[in-house]
């Protein structure tokens, strides 16, 4: 009779095996993507490899609360806490999107103690490209 295949690393039993070893990262890039529905904060090293990330959804906010400034502030704090422990001192900030969480996330990043070399808005703007969707009638 065939032996049952053991389940390794399912969602229920959490992380099996060890995490990647924490590297010392003195400088990095913080990407903030703020949409109307959610805010995603990703911290990468200078080469673009993801070190840490967080979003309003992973912080426990659900539904319309994910788009709030407080949710963005919490997500930014969560993402940055881990990289500060890994020794990040300087960072560049790239902010994308029109959401409410833009300023709140930036305020949380400033409060974390990381020295910001610059803050850049990288929201994609069309040079009159695709036709936008029709306006909502509520």
From Swiss-Prot:
HAMAP family: Ribosomal_uS11 (MF_01310)
Alphabetized GO MF terms: rRNA binding; structural constituent of ribosome
Domain of life: Eukaryota
GO cellular component: chloroplast; ribonucleoprotein complex; ribosome
Source lineage: Eukaryota, Viridiplantae, Streptophyta, Embryophyta, Tracheophyta
Family: Belongs to the universal ribosomal protein uS11 family.
Name of the protein in question: Small ribosomal subunit protein uS11c
GO-annotated biological processes: translation
Record PROSITE patterns: RIBOSOMAL_S11
Region of interest (Disordered), residue spans: 1-23
InterPro entries: Ribosomal_uS11, Ribosomal_uS11_bac-type, Ribosomal_uS11_CS, Ribosomal_uS11_sf
Basic residues bias (residue ranges): 9-23
Complex and partners: Part of the 30S ribosomal subunit.
Keywords of this entry: Chloroplast, Plastid, Ribonucleoprotein, Ribosomal protein, RNA-binding, rRNA-binding
Compartments in which it is found: Plastid, Chloroplast
């Amino acid at each position: 009779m065939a032996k049952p295949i053991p389940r390794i690393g399912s969602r229920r039993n959490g992380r099996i095996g060890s995490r990647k070893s924490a590297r010392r990262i003195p400088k990095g890039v913080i990407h903030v993507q703020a949409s109307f529905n959610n805010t995603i904060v990703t911290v990468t090293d200078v080469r673009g490899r993801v070190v840490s990330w967080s979003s309003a959804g992973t912080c426990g906010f659900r539904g319309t609360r994910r788009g709030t400034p407080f949710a963005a502030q919490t997500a930014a704090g969560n993402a940055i806490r881990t990289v500060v422990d890994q020794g990040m001192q300087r960072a560049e900030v790239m902010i994308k999107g029109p959401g409410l969480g833009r300023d709140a996330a930036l305020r949380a990043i400033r409060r974390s103690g990381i020295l910001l070399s610059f803050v850049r808005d990288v929201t994609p703007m069309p040079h009159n490209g695709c036709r936008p969707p029709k306006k909502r009638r509520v």
